[in-house]
Structures are given as C-alpha cells and as structure tokens.
Amino acid sequence: MGCFKIVQCTCNHQENPLGLDRTPRFGWKMRSDTRGDAQTAYRITVSTDARRAQAGQGDVWDSGQTAGDENVSVAYAGPPLQPRTRYYWCVTAWNRAGEAAVSRPAFFETGKLNEAWRARWITAPFLKMDKTDTGAPYLRRTFPLRGEVRSARLYICGLGYHEAFIEGKKVSENLLEPAFTKYDALSYYRVYDVTEHLPAAGPATLGVALGNGWYNCFTEDAWNIRQASWRAVPKLLCELYITYADGTQDCICSDTGWKTSPGPITFNSIRNGEWYDARLELPGWSESTYGADGWQDAELVRGAGGVLRAAEMQPIRVMQELAPVNAYRTQEGRWIFDLGQNFAGKVRLTAYGPAGSEIVLRYCEDLTGDGQHVEQKHISGFVRTGEFQTDKYIKKSDGPEEWTPQFVYHGFRYVEAEGLPEELPGPCIMGLVMHTSFERTGHFECSDDTLMTIQRLCHWSSISNCQGVPTDCPHREKNAWTGDAGTVHDQLLLNYDAFLFLEKWLDDLCQSQRPNGSIPCVCPSTGWGYNWGNGPDWSMVLTTLPWALYEQTGDAAILARYYPFICRHFDFMSSMAVDGIVNYGIGDWCAPFDGPAISVNMSTFKAPVALTDTACYYRSARMLSKMSRVLGLDDPYLARSEEIRAALLRNFVDADTGEVAGACQTSDGCVAFHHLLKPQEEARLMERLAERIAQNGWHIDYGILGSKYVLNMLGEYGRTDVIYKMLTREDYPGYLYWVAHGCTTLAECWNLGGSHNHYMFSDVSAVFYRYFAGIRPDGDIPAYRSFLLAPALDLAIDTLSCSVESPHGTIFAGWKKDGDTVTFTAGVPFGTTARLRLPAGVQAPENGAVLGGGRHEFCWKIAQSAG
C-alpha cells in the first residue's frame, strides 16, 4: 500500500480564516506515492469541537461519504451557521486502492453574518467637511476586564482607513484598511484575533486612528474623487467581543462613550501625502494609564450607506524592505536617495536635525537630467490641488527620530529629502514595499537573461499595482482601469495567489454596474468613466475574469454569481451596436506612437477601434454561451455570436484576400485570438502575421490589446521563435528599450512617455508559463484537472524551470540541455493528468502521451534550437 495523505485544507481559499460572511467552500490537496492515484470519494465533517470533527462526529454538518473526485470548493450544505462562531472541519478522502486519509482539523470563523451591529458609527466632532487640511482623528475607549480572557475578537470598519491599538500595540500588520470600494454600496470590515493583546488583568484601552483614504479624498483630480457620492469625514464602527474563561462575554462597542482628539498627523491625502508633527504626539494615547484630559466625546454619525461585509481578501502589508543603493547631497542642499527599484510603498525615515526642523520628502520614479531633483512633472498633472507625492515630518527633539507614514502609499524609486543636515550620522531612508499580501505561488526561471529581465519587470509592476484594487499605476492615477486588469489577470493568477484579490474587484465591478448594464472604465468609480472609455474592449473583463476564476477552480458557483451581471452588460453592448458593429471603446491603447502620453489620438490607431470592440462583443457572446452550458441554462448566445461574427467579417476581413482592416499586428492577432475564421483560414492568417512581424524587423507594433492577442496566438501556433525574436530586440519599441533607459518596471508607452510603472503589458509573463514552459489548460477542462505540457524545447534556452500552483498541487515543467540531448522533468499533481505535446524537432515516442499524477523524467534527442 502506498503513502496517501491530505496535505492542505482551505476554506474560501484561505487557511483557517477569521470572519466569513459567505457560504464556506472547502478545498483540500492530496499526495500519494502511487503514480496516477486519484480520489474516489470524500466526507466532510463540521463541528464546534476539533476532536469531534476529526473523529467523524459532524454534529453541525456531515456530508456523508460522497463518491467523486471533487476536492475544490465543495460548498457547506448544513444548517444555518451562527455569527461570530468558530467551526472545526475535517475531510476524509478515499483513493483508488480504498485507502482513507483524514486531514488534521482546520477551522473557520463566521463573521457578523446577518446579525445586527450593536455598535454605532462615530466620528470626532472637530472634523468638518469644508476643511482641506484634514488630519487624522484619534479615538479611544477604556474598559474593565472582569476575569481571565479566553478569546477576544475585534470587528472593525474605519473609513477611510483605520489602524487599531490595544494598550499601545497595533493589533495587526495590515495597512490601508479597508480596501477601496464604492463605499455607499459596499464597505468591508476586518476581524482581528486580539486575545494576546489584552492584559492579564485590570482595565484595557482600545485606540483607533482614522485616515481619510479614498473615503474622504478632498484632493481635486481628473476623476472627480472630491465629488464622490460617498464622501464624508472619517468614521468608525467597531465591536470588541471578549469571552472569559467562565463563558461569559462582554462587547465593547463604538458609541458616544468614546473620546476623540486631533493628533500628530496634521494632513493625509491618498493623492498628496502625509504630514506629521512629532511635537503634537500623544504618548501612550492608546494605553489605560493615559490621562485623556481635553479629549472630546465622540459624536454619532450616519454610516456609509452600503452593505457591510467581512473582508476575505488578503490585506495590504509591507512585504519587503529596500535599502538605498546610492545617496548624495545636491548643490541646493537636498539629499537624493536611490532605492534601486521602482516600487509602490512608503519609507521609514530616521530624521536628523534640531527640534522643530521640517523634513520634506518628495517621491518619484525618475530624476531630472542633472540629478538634482526628482522629476514629478510627467506624472503629476492629474492631481490638481496640493503637493504631489510629498510627505512632511517636523521633529520634536534634537536627537534621531524614526517615522513611517500611516495612511498613504507612493510609487517611486527616488526620494528627494529637504531639511536634513549636511552630514548624516547614520542610515536615513529605508524603502518599504507595500502590496496586497498574496503569496507568490508561480515561478518561472530560465538561463536566458533577457527573459528573466522581462519577468522581473512584470513582477515589480504587478505587485506595485495590487493595492486592494488592480491599479494602472501607483502614482499618477492609482485607478483600477478595467482594460488593464482584463489584460493581466491571467498572469496574476499564474504568478500569485490572486484569486481573492481579483474576486473582490469583480464584486466592485458588479456594485458599479448601472441598471442599463453599463460599467465604468475605472472601478471603483465616483461616476466618472460611464460615458467614455467603457467600450467592449475595456469592459470585457466583466466576462473574462469570472471565466478565468472558474478555469482556475472549477467552481461553477463563481459563474452563477456573476452570470446576471455579464448578461446585463451584454445587453448594454447590444444596445450600442449598429448592424452588429460596436464602436465606442478606447482601442489598442499605447501602440507605438510619437509624442507624450495621454496625447494618443484614437483615429491614428492602425487597428480600427470598431474591429477590436466588435471582436470583444463577439467573445462575450461566445463565453456567455459556454457559461450557459456549464450552468445548465438555455443558451441564446451561440446564435447571437454567429450574427456578430458575420457582421465583423463583412466589415473588416476581405473575403478574397483574407486581409484584415488595419493590416497590422493587432488586427491580425485580434481576428485570430477571437477565432473568427475557419481553422484553415486562421492558420493562413497566422502565417501572414509571422511574416508581417519579420518584415517589421521583429519589432513590436501593438498596444495593450495586441499584446495579448499577438503573443498568445503565436504561442498557440508554436511560434515561440517569433515571440523570442520580438522580446529580445534591444531598440525601440520593445521591453529591452525600456531596460536600456533605466526602467526596473514596465512602462506605459513604448517611447517612455508617461508612467514608468504600468503593468498593462505584463501578459507576456503568462506567455512564459503557457507557451515557453508549456503549462496551460487542455481545452475547457477547469482547475487543471487535465492540462497540457507543451514545452518550447526548440528554443535556444539551456535550462528552464517553471511551476504553477493548481488547486490539486504543484505543476512543474523544466528542462536541461546538454548538446543535442535534453532532459525534461514534469510534476503532475495527485488526481490530475497531463497531455504531452512536443515540438517537431524533438525525437520522442512519448509525444502525445497522457501522464498521470507523479514525477516524470525523460531524456530525448533534440534538433538545433531556434531563436
């Protein structure tokens, strides 16, 4: 008998989550040393006691032994769960040999569910909406402890941002919570386990500092954030439940018994920066020994008006620290710190100088030509009031003082510091890299330095722009553009555990949908973006992202949840169509052009906007057709898709020559990517595309849409040699052109106009996984239950190693070449199969073989490598 065991259990894609308001969905991974083994049945038991759950006593719910191989997102189907309750669960799985494996007990805790809040929304009486120098209010409440504490949970929503402290210690490393939403539709509360923060005896104090965030953004910008329908002064709602050893419970609620005071954060704006006057500090303000003389009573205030839901997405945190690689003093007496990497985050400042001195920190990704200042002009134009990416600190003493901003983040590589002494007695600046704290679960490495450089650019741009929402850039806009997210969500799911992050943003999209089915081009939106930029090309993400999440998990409940919203959006597109053609989108944004960013005239795009818009309209119909079949619903969309396809071909593809309107890389790639032609015609079109690229000197000639179309279709047709030649061009336009000009992240425009930290061209990373390593889904089979291994062994890459974390375990593909021999290694997770597809130059009888779960190693002869 082999070794068969359960190795990981998750609930709603988390291990032991706190605070679930949605139905629990269970998942588990298994291992077996028997190649090709699989699960044949499972049983889930849920109990309020861990030992009972593991003993198979599911006094809350027992699924019973259920035949099947399902181990991803199995829904809880027991009686209604109680709010604020910990439940333990175990799963027993049986394999083909009849062996049973029992998991260790795991747990989940419910959130508030439908329980009414006992707490009231409160604010500080000194906060006024007409002020534009808004600082951060501090709120506190001291309370007795009646005995030995068994457990304590804090349920909290502080708008715009909150940081909570108990007896002087912050309760979490989380930052900028809650995540940005359309607050008058939906806000998130977070649940913290604060048991260890409470003292053993005596009184305790809970303190909360509130930032403005996106909720009270008073800065004028191009997207009308100051006029947001939800905008109001910062406010707090929280309940601290304390359970004692004797089983009794206290609830400390936000109410008028709280005290409030201004503090050292005299200004904070997510669009401008943060100002901190250390002379105004309140030492010990969140401790019981503090005398709150002069503090004012909190006031009751109306809430944000939307639904309150427990946050499941990973929080934003500091994930890495970067020390300066260079520091120097300018001719004007300022200091320049180069952190060596463009990123999103903030700094930890060690401030030197006399008491009362002000240190001004300005952030940006570039320096002026003479290196004397940070260059902010190219990205600051949309922020119309206040200073751009500027923090200020006023010292309280003559000694060194350490400070980190609380309620902002910036996009930068360089920091310009004004007000520091001529000589620095010690380290001064440390970069703190911030992003949504998902794990990096995918890995791609190879011996080719160019590909690894591009992969690093994609990584740093990606994490810079995952800040509770998928932003376009971390400095100029911080906006969640739909088109950018639609282009990059595949690589995010391959590189990171980004499911919850993307699911949260999908909910944002649905909350922003208007009754007519339209969605904005940026989301969350203040109302901007419904009348421009929200064509099918950008809004297509409402269709593609649910399918991508379904493809990742195999959970049809995802499709069921978003299906009505997708249908309404399809109806909106149909209302905008004229004779089957739609033409109200942005088009192939940022294809190579001359001039500064945000000056692109859409009429100059080679690929007609009506072509790309209508192709996306067609794809939405096709995907709705597939979703309807998965959900067992009537399918009117297949016939609709054929009508759209006929209209597109009539208008944009020459029936005699097969030439596509625009005669460019994006046009050809668009028609092929959306499979608008018959297979033989599509193959000829791909030959024409490869020829077109060669005639263009292997140069890139596409924008955001074409980046996905061209590279993926070349990969589908086995033309990774063409992709390789495009990616390794060192001149304009191309990735290496950016690198040659000092970029450490992806730029917005091929000519380096505009932002230098945009992630919209990062789908190339997904191409590395899918077409270089060759790990990709096999048809429409979801959750990698069956997948392809189609490594590009004919490329001139000596070594390659790639892994993808599937719901069943780690998929691995890698090779090492030695002369005309290649050793290929594959890892296939338990309960899955992989179909091997090899390039023509590989002499292998295993080509086309189906590999079962386990580790596989092959040694083959290989022809001369391409590329």
Report the location of each language-model feature.
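Extracellular/oxidizing-compartment recognition motifs
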Residues: 2-86, 90-476, 483-484, 500-503, ...
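Beta-strand segments within the central parallel beta-sheet cores of soluble alpha/beta enzyme folds
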Residues: 104-109, 155, 205-208, 362, ...
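Alpha-helical support elements that line or immediately flank enzyme active sites
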Residues: 152, 156, 346-365, 404-407, ...
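Active-site acid/base region of carbohydrate-active enzymes
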Residues: 161, 255-262, 424-457, 463, ...
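Active/binding-pocket-proximal capping segment
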Residues: 162, 171-173, 178, 509, ...
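C-terminal capping/lid segments that line or modulate ligand- or cofactor-binding pockets
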Residues: 206, 276-277, 477, 495, ...
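Non-catalytic C-terminal accessory modules of carbohydrate-active enzymes
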Residues: 230-239, 252-285, 310-320, 370, ...
